[in-house]
Amino acid sequence: MTTQIRHSNSSPTKNLRRRIVRWFSRGRSGNENAPSLPLPASGIYRILICRATKTLGETLLLTPLLGEIEQRFPGAEVDVLTRCAAAPELLAGWFNVGCVHLLPERMFGAPVVMARLLRGLRAAHYDLAIDPYLFSNTDRALVARSQSRFSVGLDSERKSGRLTHAVAAPENLEHAGKLPVFALRRALGEMPDAAADYPLLDLRLSDAERAAGAQALANLTGAARRTIGVYAHATGVKSFARGWWDEFLVVLAARFPQHAIVEILPASGGSLLGDRYPAFFSSRPRRLGALVANLDLFVSGDCGVMHLASASGAPTAGLFVASDINGWNVYGPRRGSFDARGEPPAQIAAQVASAFDAG
């Protein structure tokens, strides 16, 4: 996976933080007497995933790993260590998730809180700790400090600290949601194929949540109509201008004349499309996901809400203008990613309409 857009590693601040993390993880990598491969398929019941991300999207990208763990270790409980404040709600539907431990936003600025948290991790006596991300030394350091019996993660020259089951990153697989699943399968002694089936992102919405979302959507659109949801917000260079969206939606609406269009509002609560369409706002990701799950098509740029839509099960079109598509695309049935770099909006709209043509 490239480090495009989301993973600039060249700033002096990040270099200093990387050196601190390397010191933090020195020589602390779990039980060094454990065998290299394979990881035992039984006797593992307490599992820790360390992912020090703050974002909604990267938290949802852990759900394929949760699905793989659920299948491989059906009697296990998984704790998640994260900086994402929304993680407890995002993962609330997963029966195998026990505790979601929230790291302080500035970990090195809260030494007392961190010391207390790390003591708790060591006291939990985890059987397995997983470092799920290829480019984070912080995740590796947290795995090391957990002192779990076994530790699994992808290995690269960017990583510091040993694991009992370090897995070389594959050359032909880059997706951030699939890579930790690959690592676990490889640690179990398998030779996974990059083209094999991987669990999808999954919000695990309940029937009651979906029904409430359907009612909210019906309230917005009036009579029962097929509906397209549009989320026009993305950060920085991943965003599209208002004029771009206007041209895109003219073509999309013409291709789907029987569909209503609903705007999904960003955290600011303001329309980015000039209040031309009925709009829905929620500060609660599961409530938002419940409504999106009832859409016939969801369209957005590359962002966390794109992954939320995919995890809700909605047909999802992700529009990429800057990020690495191979590393962050939406995958699975009724999901598609489109490279919009340098392409006119009308052409991208036509591609989306052709891919998701509902007749």
Question: Positions of the model-derived regions?
Answer:
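Catalytic machinery of carbohydrate-active enzymes
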Residues: 1-359
